[in-house]
Amino acid sequence: SAVMFDFVIVAFVSFASYKFKLPQLAYIAQILAFVAPLLTAGQTDAVFLFSYLLFISIATLFLAGITGWRKLIVFSLFFVGMYSVPYMGDFYFNSRYSNDAPIILNFAYLFSMLYLLSGIFAVIKKGVQEYETEIVLAVLNGLFLFMWIYNVAPAEWSSMIFAAWAVVFAFGSFTAFKFSSKLAPFYAYGAVAIAFIGAATSVELDGASLVIAFAMEALLILLCVLLLTKDTKAAGKAAMVFIFPVVLSFSSMMNYANSAELWSADFFALLLVAVALI
């Protein structure tokens, strides 16, 4: 088939890029590999398509692992994300994409785990030379996973799924710091974990309860960073998470100003935010 023929060409070009140490050839091979499904006639089965993308992504991770060309992984995630857009954006309409989206969601979990493990192993094995690449990879991976969960995962399970992935990324953040003592990957994966915690919380709560929960989570995050890194500068940067409860507290401030009650939920929300900031 056309896809197999393209795959043979891609394999040859990838080997040549490794043999002669030419990253430009690797990027060309990657583009050919990810564009190949678009060149086939007719509609490609969704499971076959994402199985193919998964195989190409694993091959990309292997090539990046032996060459150190980490930007290949970022481009790989970008292409997978582009193929995912129709399944995420069209899920609320009756089409072949919406029918296949719940199945492809499982592939999204596999992709995210692969990219996460790739980043962690790179940090543990030899450290990270280009922090910007790891930060971009972590952010894109988190955004990719967030969009899939938000648009496709069952609403009644979304908070639990966000919380579970928050634990996974938090563990990745801790592992990256423990074995490298580098703050860049710690911040990158930790930021994704914090975003997922916030997403899980916002799904379940609203109003003053959400402000209180965000303030408590921000305080807990700050304490965890201080205990893990024992670095006041790192804790100072982590204090940026207080932006979210502070911004949300403005609505509680307006509600409390217009309320006749003294000891209301909005009062305790404002009190907790004020104490946490002190």
Where are these regions (language model features)?
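Extended, compositionally biased regions that are outside compact catalytic cores
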Residues: S1-A191, F196-I278
